[in-house]
């Protein structure tokens, strides 16, 4: 039996990964992390989506100690969420240091226990938001460290790594779940479900990608299929 663990936040990217995993694996588990995020609604959204999509099990793990160590506008009310600024440089205030190191490692431990072969994450380098822990180089390095530390060949899969946001929308549409992704996921840094606030960087990236896909659905779909091997 093919088992996978999806690192699941209830946002656009991880929900798209979950939808695909349910098509490609016999048994899918989700792991969501409570890291003291300021918008607790994302945990509720993740629980609702995992239940409605029919995953085998959904674990919410407490890693709130991360909030004590890593200050970020996603975890601290006194650090404002910045509006989208294409000229911004350096690490954004929304970066949570060590978050994906913790998430992927804990998900790997869970995968080890249930004898899953893959950990799936929505990390993406193409629409790079300044997060070093979303880079392909980082994921591969951590995957190697996990396998060495556990003496087991686990795979950290990143189905969206080389897709832009328009192609991520196309992938959702390929699996006939674009409306669910658009209206029921929570990607917004200000905690607004669906199309979000429209002002933060996450909402801007999501809306721009949807617009690009809707303008050229056939060509974007073909490019997504070429990149993912779904053609």
Swiss-Prot record:
Top-level EC class: ligase
Catalytic activity: 7-carboxy-7-deazaguanine + NH4(+) + ATP = 7-cyano-7-deazaguanine + ADP + phosphate + H2O + H(+)
Pathway named in the protein's UniProt entry: Purine metabolism; 7-cyano-7-deazaguanine biosynthesis
EC number per UniProt: 6.3.4.20
GO MF annotation: an example: ATP binding
Bound cofactor: record note: Binds 1 zinc ion per subunit.
Keyword Magnesium: no
Keywords: ATP-binding, Ligase, Metal-binding, Nucleotide-binding, Queuosine biosynthesis, Zinc
Cofactor(s) this protein cannot do without: Zn(2+)
InterPro entries linked: QueC, Rossmann-like_a/b/a_fold
Pfam families: QueC (PF06508)
Residues engaged in binding Zn(2+): 188, 197, 200, 203
Positions that bind ATP: 8-18
Function: Catalyzes the ATP-dependent conversion of 7-carboxy-7-deazaguanine (CDG) to 7-cyano-7-deazaguanine (preQ(0)).
Family: Belongs to the QueC family.
Protein name listed in UniProt: 7-cyano-7-deazaguanine synthase
Taxonomic lineage from the root: Bacteria, Pseudomonadati, Pseudomonadota, Gammaproteobacteria, Enterobacterales
